[in-house]
Amino acid sequence: MVRAVLICIAAGLMLAVSAAATAQQLSFGSAADAKAMLERAVVAVKSDKSKALEMFNKGEGGFLDRDLYPYCFNISDGKNVATQAKNVLGTDVRTLKDRTGRSYGQEIYDAAKEGVIAEVTYMWPRPGPDPTLVTKVSFITRVGDLGCAVGYYAKTD
């Protein structure tokens, strides 16, 4: 009887740990989610650029999903014109550095090519209180006079 109870408790603990791990994975967007959001952002910009940028800045229209959001910059001067990271709105994307001090903004700027989705990798902490740096990947493309991107946190299994 005691053995059966212990087996049930162990099974319950395994399920709880598994559920917690699954919940954490679901709280972050995947590479496929990020690429799909970028593709939707491209369609929105082509349809109505000013409305799209407004939606991106406000996180409306499905353009804020967990830790995923589009950000866009002017090709002419590199200025960020849409982002959920309000501290970089209006700054030059080319000056961005990751938390290790590595400049990655110029890579993002240079990667913005019409009809191509490129990737740039850098180190950034996930949203929340944990300051641990993890690999973040941004998918980037060009839409008219804008460079647009969506970044996701790579799995750290």
What residues fall within each predicted segment?
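N-terminal membrane-sensor/transducer module of prokaryotic signaling receptors
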Residues: 2, 6-157
